[in-house]
A protein has these predicted regions:
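Generic structural signal for hydrophobic
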Residues: 131, 154-155, 620
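Short alpha-helices
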Residues: 174-228
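Histidine/acidic-residue-rich, glycine-tolerant segments that coordinate divalent metal ions
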Residues: 142-194
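Acidic, two-metal ion nucleic-acid-processing modules in DNA metabolism proteins
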Residues: 98, 103, 239-334, 369, ...
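Generic detector of well-ordered alpha-helical packing
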Residues: 87-91, 144, 166-167, 182, ...
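Histidine-centered active-site/metal-ligand motif
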Residues: 166-167, 182, 356, 414, ...
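Acidic-glycine-rich active-site phosphate/pyrophosphate-binding loop
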Residues: 73, 168-181, 339, 509-514
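Hydrophobic helix-and-loop "lid/oligomerization" segment in the mid-to-C-terminal part
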Residues: 2, 10-137, 158, 208-429, ...
Length: 660
């Protein structure tokens, strides 16, 4: 069935919208979107017209003057510097930007990124001891270090350290030579939303300003890449950086980014923040998840085109491996959920031996999308489970774990995502306790996802011009989400599945001017509920579809519901007719589910509606006549089973439910 969603339409404020229209000259739909994002005239002027000259003075960051003096002194003394990074895209890009910059200043600089599985996130004492033994004079952290008080304390007398980080600052700040973090309580820096690469970039700016008396604006495309990937609010400085970085990415990108764009098949596209988040960043992230993040840094700091091209291809292949690992674990997890039955009604908890810990967080996110419940995915190794958690709106997964801290080995995180470890023999106990916790805390309504809609649009008003006007709000991201619109009544002219695995759905709507295309990713089940002539309401974002020189609007479906649903009615005679059709369609061989469904819709008897005809497949699966499975290439298939003797329809739950 189509997953139910709560449709929430933003109320807007006509008076505020009129002020924005009058003062800023924006289109009414843009004014409505700005009001929905709580942007007033002053903020709106900066939001729409902000430039690189509006970036803040880096020296208003606490300890920046100390850090600049120490870095320049170390360079002038020809002493070795090590950048200590992190394995996610923010850490990779922060390492790359600072490394490239310090090389320009003539520094003796290298970088160190911990291995995800064996070392984990952040500073570790063993690595620092190794750097000290190598004769390192100065360590500069990027995207980490703010919570490493004890580790810094253990080495501070033997090595100079500068911490640059953007994570929430604890009460005990490490006693490094300098700590640059805009979230420190006594830091006067006005913008509190910088990413790790953003903080590293501010250090570069301060150093360049001291050396050359001008703004440093190189590598903005790399800074933009890390900023978008880390899902920080795209307002203030972040918006300016990403907007300028995207311009550079589309005009004259870093060689590594260019090759990454090429292998991702985006070389003919205008790169947007969406392309960064969904296509480029995962390829960099794959290195840290599956192999080692240093390869991603090498991609961004190497100038040899042949080497960079080879690394880009390698990262692309690593990403395929990551996708395959993720796909396999996801499928095993789905089977686990199905086998749990009602045990999975309130919280999704799945576990498997030797599941790759680098991808369990992604799998957890996919399971939340699928089942919309707080989700824990656990990889078991040597009797210990390492878990990754993702939550639903309004539910604090960290608090949920804290309620079970007595049976956890360790845990950490925040409201939306967390991690933990546990003895494998206590996973069932964890499931029982979290089920009880979720049952008490989460309401039935909160288990239904919300689709927030900015504005209604009549189907006949959608054209390329409105997309161009709305694009003034780009780049989109956290705190400036992609606008979502709704058509409250549209008629389906055609519907089809697309993609190699037939797992995406294309719908064509009727308009007074012709037709309007829409895409629903990973929604093959729509084919069973929406048909030619179905009248629906649909929530969507807008994008341009460019094909053979033609540009047209395209809807990217967020939610869709039929305004009326065909009733399912099953009869013995109707199923007999469908048995003949399906048998002829399959011809005793395996066929893709999509091909069989298409054949059913073409050949069904006139007295059966579409849903009833397609539901016959479920009856025949329950009777063992056909068997559903996934092919080696990931396609959903049906296998015909030759069964002798008479079958009893009352053994089919589906038939008993819908029989007339």
């Amino acid at each position: 069935m189509i997953k139910k969603k709560r449709w929430r339409l933003c109320k807007g404020d006509q008076e505020k919208e009129n002020i924005l229209i009058r003062e800023l000259g924006v289109n009414p739909i843009v004014a409505k979107l700005m009001v929905n994002r709580h942007i007033d005239v002053d903020e709106g002027r900066q939001f729409l017209q902000g430039t690189l000259s509006d970036l803040l003075d880096p020296f208003t960051l606490k300890d920046m003057d100390v850090a600049v003096s120490l870095v320049l002194e170390t360079i002038e003394s020809h002493k070795p510097i090590v950048i200590y990074g992190d394995y996610d895209v923010d850490g990779i890009t922060a390492t790359s930007v600072l490394y490239r910059f310090l090389k320009k200043l003539g520094a003796d600089v290298t970088y160190y990124i911990p291995e995800r599985q064996s070392e984990g996130y952040g500073l570790n004492l063993e690595a620092l001891e190794h750097l000290i033994e190598r004769g390192t004079a100065l360590v500069i952290t990027v995207d980490c270090g703010i919570s490493s008080y004890d580790i810094v304390e253990a080495v501070r007398d033997r090595i100079d350290m500068i911490i640059t980080d953007h994570h929430t600052a604890p009460d005990m700040i490490p006693r490094a030579k300098a700590v640059i973090n805009h979230k420190q309580k006594d830091c006067p820096y006005k913008d509190k939303n910088l990413s790790g690469v953003g903080v590293a970039f501010k250090l570069c700016q301060a150093l360049w300003l001291t050396k050359h008396g001008e703004w440093y604006l190189d590598d903005l495309d790399i800074v933009a890449l890390g900023t978008v990937a880390d899902v920080v609010p795209l307002v203030g400085e972040n918006r300016i950086i990403v907007k300028s970085g995207l311009e550079k990415m589309n005009r004259e990108p870093n060689l590594g980014i260019k090759k990454l764009i090429d292998v991702a098949g985006l070389h003919e596209r205008t790169i947007t923040s969406g392309h960064i988040g969904f296509t480029l960043a995962p390829r960099l992230n794959a290195a840290g998840r599956v192999t080692h993040a240093t390869r991603a840094v090498e991609l961004l700091v190497t100038d040899d085109e042949d080497i960079v091209e080879a690394i880009a291809e390698e990262l692309n292949e690593t990403n395929r491996e990551r996708q395959e690992l993720e796909r396999n674990i996801h499928e095993l997890a789905r089977v686990d959920v199905a086998n749990q039955g009602h045990k999975a009604d309130y919280v999704t908890i799945v576990a498997g031996e030797e599941w790759h810990p680098g991808v369990i967080g992604i799998v957890a996110s996919r399971l939340v999308e699928e089942f919309y419940k707080p989700t824990l995915v656990i990889s078991i190794h040597d009797g210990v489970g390492k878990g990754s958690c993702r939550s639903i709106d309004g539910f604090n997964i960290y608090d949920a774990l804290k309620s079970c801290e007595d049976i956890l080995l360790q845990f950490g995180g925040h409201a939306a995502a967390a991690g933990f470890s546990i003895d494998a023999n206590r996973i069932d106990e964890l499931r029982e306790r979290l089920t009880k916790y979720c049952k008490a805390v989460i309401t039935d309504e909160e288990y239904i996802p919300v689709v927030a809609i900015d504005a209604e649009l009549p189907v006949d008003d959608i054209d390329v011009d409105i997309i161009d006007r709305v694009s003034d709000l780009e780049p989109y991201g956290m705190a400036n989400s992609t606008p979502v619109f709704a058509i409250m009544e549209a008629t389906v002219q055609d519907i089809m599945l697309m993609g190699q695995l037939k797992n995406h759905c294309k719908i064509i709507f009727e308009t007074s001017n012709g037709t309007l295309d829409a895409i629903a990713w990973n929604s093959p089940d729509l084919f069973k509920f929406i048909f030619v002539g179905t009248v629906v309401k649909v929530a969507f974002s807008l994008q341009k579809n460019e094909w053979q020189g033609m540009v047209s609007p395209q809807l990217m479906i967020q939610a869709i519901e039929p305004l009326t649903e065909e009733p399912i009615k099953l009869s013995t005679e109707g199923l007999r007719q469908m048995y003949v059709i399906i048998k002829q369609s399959m011809r005793g061989r395996s066929q893709s589910v999509y091909n069989v469904e298409q054949d059913i819709l073409r050949r069904k008897p006139a007295d059966q509606n579409n849903r009833s005809a397609l539901t016959s497949i479920d009856v025949f699966k329950e009777l063992g006549i056909v068997e559903e499975y996934t092919s080696d290439d990931g396609q959903l298939m049906l296998r015909w089973n030759a069964i002798e003797g008479k079958l009893d329809l009352v053994t089919s739950v589906t038939f008993l439910t819908y029989s007339v």
